[in-house]
C-alpha cells in the first residue's frame, strides 16, 4: 500500500466518526483529531477561527447545536501526502437534526489539511462551505435561529 492510500485508510474513518459524534452532541472525537499546536485554522461553514484557543469553543458550540447525527459520507475529489503534510478534498454529506428539527442532509465542500505529529495525523486546517442550495438554506436557517 502506498503512503497516500495508508493515509486515507487512517484518516477517512476518523473524519466520518468525528462528524457523526459531533452531530450527536460529542465534540471529543473532533477535538482529538485536531492538533492543539498552532498554527491551526478553521474556515467553517458557520464560524472561522485561528489558534486552538479560538477553535476549541467553536467545536463545543457546534456539538451543542446538533442532534440525531445519523451518518457521514465522503465523495473524494483529491488527496495526497508529502512528508509530514497530507490533505483531503471531498464533498462531505452528513445527516443530523438541529434544535429539535427533524434530521436533514448537510452537504459541504471540505478541504482538510493534516500534519503528522508523533506518528499520528492531526488536522491543522479545515475549510468547509455549503455545496448546494439546500445546504446553504439550512445553514442560513441555523444562523437565523441563533445557533452559531
Feature map (PLM): residue ranges:
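A detector for short, charged/polar N-terminal pre-domain segments
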Residues: 1-7, 138
Amino acid at each position: 500500500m502506498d503512503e497516500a492510500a495508508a493515509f486515507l485508510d487512517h484518516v477517512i474513518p476518523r473524519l466520518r466518526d468525528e462528524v457523526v459524534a459531533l452531530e450527536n452532541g460529542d465534540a471529543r472525537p473532533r477535538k482529538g483529531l485536531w492538533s492543539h499546536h498552532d498554527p491551526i485554522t478553521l474556515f467553517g461553514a458557520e464560524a472561522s477561527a485561528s489558534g486552538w484557543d479560538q477553535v476549541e469553543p467553536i467545536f463545543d458550540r457546534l456539538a451543542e447545536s446538533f442532534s440525531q447525527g445519523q451518518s457521514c459520507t465522503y465523495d473524494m475529489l483529491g488527496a495526497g501526502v508529502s512528508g509530514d503534510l497530507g490533505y483531503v478534498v471531498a464533498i462531505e454529506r452528513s445527516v443530523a437534526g438541529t434544535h429539535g428539527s427533524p434530521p436533514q442532509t448537510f452537504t459541504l465542500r471540505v478541504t482538510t489539511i493534516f500534519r503528522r505529529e508523533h506518528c499520528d495525523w492531526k488536522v491543522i486546517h479545515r475549510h468547509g462551505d455549503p455545496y448546494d442550495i439546500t445546504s446553504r438554506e439550512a445553514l442560513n436557517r441555523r444562523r437565523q435561529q441563533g445557533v452559531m
